Amino acid sequence: LTMAYYDNGNEILTDYGASRFLNIEAKNKGHYTRENESFAKQTIAHNTLVVDETSNFGGDIKVSSRYHSDIIYSDFNGDHFQVMVAKETNAYSGVEMKRTLVYVTTPFLQFPLILDVLQANSDKEHQYDYPLWYNGHFVSLNFPYTKASNGLQTLGTKNGYQHLWL
């Protein structure tokens, strides 16, 4: 249940899982990046939910190829309102995910609104991580912060987390 968002051909939510298809000439005419296995193929590289720091379907493409998400509802006919709802029950054992994406335009706002609601249900407790790879610039915060300049640590040791810094 991933999400991609473009504005006039410009990628706003980057899918780093597509890194093997980017900058083909710079990568010796299509060779994969070194991070292809350790990051790009991992669920954390996509704009979707990660459960217990593991890639969906156990990272096994043969298993994932046997399943697909189910569309629950969609309506793309409105001029100012479009919606898509889908669910996934096979990506993680015992976890059901449902994602609702809504695109809304209104004369009161200069730019459209995108609502992204992702629900996860399970009978067991899990750690949920929800990365959104925004292709933008940090401008300001309304609270003080300290910039990390040394002693950075990785968020984890495998499944792409070794490429993320705290």
Q: Where does each model-flagged region fall?
A:
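Glycine-rich (often Gly-Gly/Gly-Pro-rich) flexible segments and glycine-rich loop motifs
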Residues: 46, 148-166
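Catalytic and substrate-binding regions of extracellular carbohydrate-active enzymes
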Residues: 1-151
